[in-house]
């Protein structure tokens, strides 16, 4: 798998945004990705030094539409901790255009 196939998207929640102050970034990753693959992908794409990777599998939630029910997609979430001397990852543009 290539690096851009492993990292799918950043997770933007209150908890993940609070973790960015401590250089902890949260990403949705491919279901088959390992910790080593996630570490190498983040280092390759963003040019930073990764210290630790925590991965969790998130089950799909039960959703209903009338009498029909199904599950949302399951996903795999990776929390990546960067080294203290590493640069921050810019996930958002700082364009303040009106």
Curated annotation (Swiss-Prot):
Q: Which InterPro entries match?
A: Nucleotide-bd_a/b_plait_sf (IPR012677), Ribosomal_uL23-like (IPR013025), Ribosomal_uL23/eL15/eS24_sf (IPR012678), Ribosomal_uL23_CS (IPR001014)
**A molecular function (GO) term:** rRNA binding
Q: Supply one GO CC term from the record.
A: ribosome
Keywords noted in UniProt: Ribonucleoprotein, Ribosomal protein, RNA-binding, rRNA-binding
KW Ribonucleoprotein (keyword) present:
yes
SUPFAM superfamilies referenced in this protein's UniProt entry, alphabetically: Ribosomal proteins S24e, L23 and L15e
Listed under GO biological process in this entry are: translation
Q: Which residues form a coiled coil?
A: none
The keyword Disulfide bond is annotated on this UniProt entry: no
Describe the subunit structure: Part of the 50S ribosomal subunit. Contacts protein L29, and trigger factor when it is bound to the ribosome.
Protein purpose: One of the early assembly proteins it binds 23S rRNA. One of the proteins that surrounds the polypeptide exit tunnel on the outside of the ribosome. Forms the main docking site for trigger factor binding to the ribosome.
Q: What's this protein's family per the entry? A: Belongs to the universal ribosomal protein uL23 family.
Q: State the protein's name.
A: Large ribosomal subunit protein uL23
| Organism of provenance | Limosilactobacillus reuteri (strain DSM 20016) (Lactobacillus reuteri)
